Curated annotation (Swiss-Prot):
Keywords: ATP-binding, Chaperone, Nucleotide-binding, Phosphoprotein, Stress response
Factors inducing expression: By stress conditions e.g. heat shock.
Residue ranges, annotated region (Disordered): 601-641
Protein name as annotated: Chaperone protein DnaK 2
NCBIfam families per record: PRK00290.1, prok_dnaK
Family: Belongs to the heat shock protein 70 family.
Known function: Acts as a chaperone.
Chain's gene name: dnaK2
Composition skew (Acidic residues), residue ranges: 626-635
Source lineage: Bacteria, Pseudomonadati, Pseudomonadota, Gammaproteobacteria, Vibrionales
């Protein structure tokens, strides 16, 4: 069996590792570096450059040098965060025919997975050069808070790169594998704080060893898929551009070449300020006007950088609280804190994490390499090279379908261990309904419209009947990669329809963050909406059953009673068009009062039928009943569920 490699496909940098014997090893690329810049350049002579060679020519080729493409994976062009990126990226982000966010280089439009595949190709080539053989299998990591569309897009990138993606695993989980594989002892609970180039994740993971088998179980995860080192860089870029404009009166944002130089200088200054208290940004001949060339010379202190990004660091703390709450743990339950991602080298980040958890983060984990090392370990598990390791990951957000009244009915709750499977039986909402639409949603809100639509499909050819009689079995199958497969089956006809959620229906990065935060902030609104829908459904059901009883009684129902009931039904239907729960409740109560005569007549009719049936039974059996003891019993019919 050929070697399976582990790849950390990062926003800013990527890394590859594999098992060398029984030890994971990070492989150096052709330039001798252990990490590869996630930068892709399309040159004038048709060459595609990846990594440091691409970065080196970026100043002279800014429009065709692409970076931070991971931020576009599984994204729609209209997404708010994509629109923000359009304003600051030197290259063109364009709208694809299907609405996805694509990029343009040398006049050619390309999908984000297509561009990311170039980085994966370099990773693949690096491994093949080291091993001296072809490599096809890979485990690729993604942020824990990546949604279905983003995970699918990552797999697509692997496929384009010629890789068989054996597994998609979450970056914090991979880091936990790298940290905990060789740790001896009993149970420990760790917090993995992963602040990378474009995303932030926090995962609470329990590591336990029982009978020689080491288990890594993710208890909860949270995060922000639009928060990372690139955002820190942008704050520095805006500061430098602003200072230059104040001094020279020239706005560099309209000059792609100048902005590329400023970007490189900002990133360099940010890194230097992790070890120095101040640094100078010197860019001679950054631009020119009628008076001659202009030079940038700005002194930046660590304190200034911290003031620019303080709110970004603060944004990482709320997900920490939610993750602990979801795991039913307190800060004192955390044994170790692991920092992952290059941005965690910033002293301010380390200080905030230390202050939050009340303990220093571990220093024995390489934040740039731990994720790739963990991916290599998981690759070894899949290849049978690593024994006695069990990885139990979770889904970050709840999954469900839209049901009557615009409610999201959850089939799989957030933080459920994957792979997992869940099913639920639903029925039709209308009489003689021959088709249903299965609308798949992801999020935490009760109201469907506040969650993200992942896709929808129709199940047709349902056996016609009155509402509620057809039974539709909906099954959600969430695989180990966190990718969802949905099927719906009509139990009467066994007709089935399936769908695998595709990237075009995925979530945007801000959407996921907003869903969870809004769910926390809008619990009361959700409760009121749920009560409104319940009232609506009860009223609708009462109207349906009342009309049915009126039809069954026919002429036996006095005309004045029928008129009262018809008026009450009309009032309910009017109330149902509004959003006032009290009005619906009042109209429902009025209908119940108006239909009391109907109920009494139905009961009298049933009693008369019962009496007639009993008389016939007595006439038939009276002569044969002698001295034998006769026992009466009630039998309850048990129906198959």
């Amino acid at each position: 069996m050929s070697k399976i490699i582990g790849i950390d496909l990062g926003t800013t940098n990527s890394c590859i590792a594999l098992l060398d014997g029984d030890k994971p090893r990070v492989i150096e690329n052709a330039e001798g570096e252990r990490t590869t810049a996630s930068v892709i350049a399309y040159t004038q002579d048709g060459e595609i450059l990846v990594g440091q060679p691409a970065k080196r020519q970026a100043v002279t080729n800014p429009k065709n040098t692409l970076f931070a493409i991971k931020r576009l994976l599984g994204r729609r062009f209209e997404d708010e965060e994509v629109q923000r990126d359009i304003e600051i990226m030197p290259f063109n982000i364009v709208k694809a025919d299907n609405g996805d966010a694509w990029v343009e280089a040398k006049g050619k439009k390309m999908a984000a997975p297509q561009v990311s595949a170039e980085v994966l190709k370099k990773m693949k080539k690096t491994a093949e050069d080291y091993l001296g053989e072809e490599v096809t299998g890979a485990v690729i990591t993604v942020p824990a808070y990546f949604n279905d569309a983003q995970r699918q897009a990552t797999k697509d990138a692997g496929r384009i790169a010629g890789l068989d993606v054996k597994r998609i695993i979450n970056e914090p989980t991979a880091a936990a594998l790298a940290y905990g594989l060789d740790k001896q002892g009993g149970e420990r609970t760790i917090a993995v704080y992963d602040l990378g180039g474009g995303t932030f994740d926090i995962s609470i993971i329990e590591i336990d060893e029982v009978d020689g088998e080491k288990t890594f179980e993710v208890l909860s995860t949270n995060g922000d898929t639009h928060l990372g080192g690139e955002d820190f860089d942008n704050r520095m870029i805006n500061y430098l551009v602003g200072e230059f404009k104040k001094e020279q009166g020239i706005d560099l944002k309209s000059d792609p070449l100048a902005m590329q130089r400023v970007k490189e200088a900002a990133e360099k200054a940010k890194i230097e300020l992790s070890s120095a208290q101040q640094t100078d940004v010197n860019l001679p001949y950054v631009t020119a006007d009628a008076a001659g060339p202009k030079h940038m010379n700005v002194k930046v202190t660590r304190a200034k950088l911290e003031s620019l990004v303080e709110d970004l660091v603060q944004r990482t703390l709320e997900p920490l609280k939610i993750a602990l709450t979801d795991a039913n743990l307190s800060i004192t339950d955390i044994t170790d804190v692991i920092l992952v991602g290059g941005q965690t080298r910033m002293p301010m980040v380390q200080a905030k994490v230390t202050e939050f958890f009340g303990k220093e983060p571990r220093k024995d984990v390489n934040p740039d390499e731990a994720v790739a090392v963990g991916a290599a370990i998981q690759a070894g598990v899949l290849a049978g090279e690593v024994k006695d390791v069990l990885l139990l990951d979770v889904t970050p957000l709840s999954l469900g379908i839209e049901t009557m009244g615009g409610v999201m009915t959850k089939l799989i709750e957030k933080n459920t261990t994957i792979p997992t499977k869940a099913n639920q039986v639903f029925s039709t909402a209308e009489d003689n309904q021959s088709a249903v639409t299965i609308h798949v949603l992801q999020g935490e809100r009760k109201q469907s419209s506040y969650n993200k639509s992942l896709g929808q499909f129709n199940l047709e050819g349902i056996q016609a009947g009155s509402r509620g009689t057809a039974q539709i079995d909906v099954t959600f199958d969430l695989d180990a990669d966190g990718i969802l497969h949905v099927s719906a089956t009509d139990k009467a006809t066994n007709k089935e329809q399936k769908i695998t959620i595709q990237a075009s229906g995925g979530l945007s990065n801000d959407d996921i963050e907003k869903m969870v935060q809004e769910a926390e902030a809008n619990k009361e609104a959700d409760k009121m909406f749920e009560e409104l829908v319940t009232a609506r459904n009860q009223a609708d059901q009462l109207v349906h059953s009342t009309r049915k009883q009126v039809e069954e009684l026919g002429d036996a129902l006095p005309a004045d009673e029928k008129a009262k009931i018809d008026t009450a039904i009309a009032d309910v239907e009017t109330a149902l068009k509004g959003e006032d729960k009290a009005a619906i409740d009042n109209a429902t109560q009025a209908l119940m009062t108006a239909s009391q005569a109907l109920v009494q007549m139905a009961q009298q009719q049933a009693q008369a039928q019962h009496a007639q049936s009993s008389q016939q039974t007595n006439d038939t059996t009276g002569q044969s009943s002698t001295d034998d003891d006769v026992f009466e019993a009630e039998f309850e019919e048990v129906k198959d569920k």
